[in-house]
């Protein structure tokens, strides 16, 4: 079974927890470290329950707290090369420390985190290399779509087979 819960959605910050089995991932983290910890606590979770952070794109409402959270808790950060390139310049001397936590991903190339199979897929948006995700576990599929400039045939094709 796949479980999910929003930590928040809007211009002040975005974050979504997706879990299957004992593993959970955080998609985007647009909140401060303390804010993220509090939001997770409301779900009965802590950052120690997370296996990884996945990043959709480099806009601050999705990225603001990613690298602070990742460094504090030693979490790998999965993001596209384009997103890393856009984010790297904002790290002001911390890029080398953060780079070690980064795991490059490509749109339409599945990877596994815990019990979740993750499929990033490209979407139109005003960012370098934005993606959204389909999560699979135990024969079920959950699609997520947040910032998307327009619904394309590709987006429809990717999300149509999803259960939710």
Identify the role of each PLM range.
Residues 59-63, 85-86, 127-128, 150-153:
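Active-site environment of divalent metal-dependent phosphoester hydrolases
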Residues 152-164:
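Cap/insert and terminal regions of metallo-dependent hydrolase folds
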Residues 44-45, 94-99, 162:
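Short, hinge-like loop/turn segments at secondary-structure boundaries
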Residues 40-44, 111-115, 155-158:
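Short amphipathic alpha-helix with an adjacent loop that forms part of the alpha/beta core around
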Residues 54, 119, 144:
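Conserved Rossmann-like nucleotide-binding pocket used by diverse enzymes
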Residues 33-80, 164:
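Active-site metal-binding motif and surrounding structural segment of the metallo-beta-lactamase
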Residues 81-131, 136-139:
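Metallo-beta-lactamase
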Residues 1-43, 129-147, 164:
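Conserved beta-strand hairpin/beta-sheet module of binuclear metal-dependent hydrolase folds
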